A protein has these predicted regions:
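Active-site-proximal segments of metal-dependent phosphoesterases and phosphodiesterases across multiple
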Residues: 13-17
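Glycine/proline-rich, flexible active-site/cofactor-binding loop segments
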Residues: 1-10
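Short strand-loop junctions, especially beta-strand C-caps/beta-turns
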Residues: 10-12, 152
Length: 157
């Protein structure tokens, strides 16, 4: 490829970045030299429901990067979607609500189900500006080649 082929982490099973060994296996299995990881900071934050502040998020991200640095894999982090996502309270509330009042998804029309799923994902993956103590230092530590400020808009205005 003439471009960098980057894989983006997610917050559900697959490429969460929580397992260094699995990430190494994926990246080493890609048959191109121009490969790497697009770290979505909000997606990584969504792998826990315990974060309350941007500073909690920075500490959580740095702990993950410590593991990749120790494994000599930090150079694979070539891009970053820089965003804040502290949706843990919503996730805990939804889990409780769905346990108490299960939804029969088979009874919901497809497009309504799509709308509900999209709305649910937007309440988890908040795409807010990531501003706080240590954010700049975190970005400088990772030193990505590409940075996207990835924000969710509530309107077109």
């Amino acid at each position: 490829y003439p471009f960098d082929f980057l894989v983006e982490n997610l917050w559900w099973s697959g490429l969460t970045l929580k397992n260094v060994r699995l990430t190494r296996r994926l990246i080493e299995g890609m048959h191109t030299q121009k490969k790497g990881i697009m770290l979505d900071t909000g997606h990584y934050m969504n792998t826990t429901t315990q974060l309350k502040t941007p500073e909690d998020a920075v500490a959580y991200l740095n702990k993950m990067i410590d593991k990749y640095e120790k494994a000599q894999m930090l150079h694979w982090f070539k891009g970053m979607h820089l965003q804040l996502s502290l949706g843990g309270d919503y996730v805990r509330k939804q889990r409780k609500e769905w346990r108490e009042h299960p939804i029969d998804f088979d009874k919901i029309p497809f497009y309504e189900l799509f709308r509900l799923a999209y709305d649910h994902a937007c309440h988890i993956d908040l795409h807010q500006p990531f501003i706080g103590e240590g954010v700049r230092e975190f970005v400088e530590r990772v030193a990505p080649k590409y940075i996207t400020l990835e924000y969710q808009q509530n309107s077109r205005e």
